[in-house]
UniProtKB/Swiss-Prot annotation:
Alphabetized UniProt keyword annotations: Cell cycle, Cell division, Cell membrane, Membrane, Transmembrane, Transmembrane helix
Signal peptide limits: none
All ranges on the Cytoplasmic side of the membrane: 1-21, 193-219, 289-297
This protein's name: Cell division protein FtsX
Amino acid sequence: MRFGFLLNEVVTGLRRNVTMTIAMILTTAISIGLFGGGLLVVRLADNSRSIYLDRVETQVFLTDDISANDLTCNTNLCKALRGKIEARDDVKSLRFLNRQDAYDDAIRKFPQYRDVAGKDSFPASFIIKLANPVQHKEFDAATQGQPGVLSVLNQKELIDRLFAVLDGLSDVAFVIALVQAIGAILLIANMVQVAAYTRRTEIGIMRLVGASRWYTQLPFLLEAMVAATVGAVIAIVGLLVARAMFLNNALNQFYQANLIARVDYADVLYVSPWLLLLGVALAALTGYATLRIYVRR
């Protein structure tokens, strides 16, 4: 197939259906952009989860007998419990907080409660870092109910609740992207049908002189793929602009406090090839299926 003829057919088809082409480009850009946004949220959540997992601690609160009478964990009950915990293979480090230390630590984190919280409200505790914070349930189950243990609090569960919000946002973005993708598929199918119909006479003549089915249908596929590629590029540029003009300013205070991982240009560029591939593949598969179904001769 001559490249010049093929290029001319593609340009002619796009020009004839300019309104539908623009609609398809915009719909593809929106759906791919939303999908890319969902991927960035997933990447943000994964990177931020790594930050928090490095800080995750398990707190073993001790009974009132130890809290009231043992300031340095020297009683037999406290020493036995500490030795049992430190002997575990999954424990990375352990430190003891007596009641005064627990009160000071709480007031340092929440100074607004200084006038309402009494020292007796805070039990002594062990602050423990596990070798693998994700696998904390075995430790919790083994420690809970031991002599001297009041309760066990694992921050991993609190972090999971926090990131459930981010996971929910990414799910919403993916659902909206799916709806937009369905719209893009319908537009691609309609565009290919209209393009084939408007050139039915030319196609008929070409088939009469021996042109293959693939030869006559390839321009329609390329039209859809070109439009989808433009839409995907617009989506990628949109993500870069959104990162520069919106995300960086909106999330800067969270970045400074090291509460969430940064969304860098590298993250956008990381997902960009997948977005481009998705747009082209979506157009190619839809166009091919449409031609197989509606253009049978």
